[in-house]
Amino acid sequence: MNNGIKEQIRELLKQHNAVLLAHNYMRDEVQEIADITGDSLALSIEAAKTEADVIVFCGVHFMAESAAILSPDKKVLLPRLDAGCPMADMVDARGLEELKKKHPGVPVVTYVNSTAEVKAHSDICCTSANATRVVKSLPDKKVIFAPDRNLGSFVAKSVPDKEFIFWDGYCPTHERMTVEAVLAKKTEYPEALFICHPECAPAVTALADQACSTSAMYDYCRDSKARQFIIGTEAGILYRLRLENPDKEFILASPALFCPNMKLTSQEDVLHSLKTLTPVVSVPEDIRLKAKLALDRMLAVPRD
């Protein structure tokens, strides 16, 4: 990577009292310069507690929105404003309200992969790392789960005493991974463990030795005695897995596991963002306060 750019970024971060957060799916070059890398839950927690004045969020739009919701006194920068999330765009507030009218009194559990407006119409948020705990924390026997039907189905298996009403959304990247691709890799690497994300289709997660969030994948692969792992989530995770486990082999389950939005942000974009302190992501106060309730309820659920 360009050391000159990295040095400029580090200097500007210091100058602006800024923190650089990067999601686990970012390009290698972006993860390399981040102060903190993590999944949506870890980065939400960091955004809520940071003492920095500026948060540079290397991820997609809904993540920067969540940071702005949790830290309204901070300036939140998203180096690529065009880094969106197709799954987040599959649910809107109007549609969610219509579903709520059909099921009055049923709480809405919304995956953080959603817009601020959708969060504002939800009772509680969740991430892939805490979705099961969040649902179990509710006293209700029925829940509306949006927008990811695959994560919802995964959680439902762990919470058989509750009835789920699913919004019909999905992650296009994880949806592209097929059973056939997984079986082919398992045949090619018979000793390897297959680890996948619960955003994968149920038929794929059924083949997994472990289905979990990206943060849990790091822990699982680090602690496992296995030497080979077939990884069923976005390719960006391989950077840190290989960095932290140089004696282990990580094989991407499918070349289709590539999110174009997560790959938009470059070091040059980060540098430009820090030089100009743009683009700023903000959330209207009325929406922010309602969305913050749903996020705060999630963050209040006890962690393992």
From Swiss-Prot:
The record's subcellular location field reads: Cytoplasm
Q: Per its Swiss-Prot or TrEMBL entry, what cofactor is needed? A: [4Fe-4S] cluster
Q: Which InterPro entries match?
A: NadA, NadA_sf, Quinolinate_synth_type2
Superkingdom of source: Bacteria
Please provide an example of a Pfam family that matches this protein in its UniProt record: NadA
Enzyme Commission identifier(s): 2.5.1.72
One GO term of the biological process aspect: 'de novo' NAD biosynthetic process from L-aspartate
Q: Which reaction does it catalyse?
A: iminosuccinate + dihydroxyacetone phosphate = quinolinate + phosphate + 2 H2O + H(+)
Q: How is the cofactor bound?
A: Binds 1 [4Fe-4S] cluster per subunit.
What are this entry's molecular-function GO terms?
A: 4 iron, 4 sulfur cluster binding; metal ion binding; quinolinate synthetase A activity
Q: At which positions is [4Fe-4S] cluster bound?
A: C85, C171, C259
In this chain, iminosuccinate is annotated as bound at H23, S40, Y111, V112, N113, S128, H197, P198, E199, T214
Gene Ontology cellular component annotations, sorted alphabetically:
cytosol
**Where the protein is mainly located, per its record?**
cytoplasm
Task: Identify the keywords attached in UniProt to this record, alphabetized.
Answer: 4Fe-4S, Cytoplasm, Iron, Iron-sulfur, Metal-binding, Pyridine nucleotide biosynthesis, Transferase
> Which pathway is recorded for this entry?
Cofactor biosynthesis; NAD(+) biosynthesis; quinolinate from iminoaspartate: step 1/1
Tell me which HAMAP family the record gives.
NadA_type2
Checking PANTHER family in the record gives: QUINOLINATE SYNTHASE, CHLOROPLASTIC, QUINOLINATE SYNTHETASE A
Q: Which family does it belong to?
A: Belongs to the quinolinate synthase family. Type 2 subfamily.
Q: What does this protein do?
A: Catalyzes the condensation of iminoaspartate with dihydroxyacetone phosphate to form quinolinate.
Extract the NCBIfam families matched here: nadA, PRK09375.1-2
Q: What is this protein called?
A: Quinolinate synthase
The source organism is: Pelobacter propionicus (strain DSM 2379 / NBRC 103807 / OttBd1)
Please state the gene responsible for encoding this protein: nadA
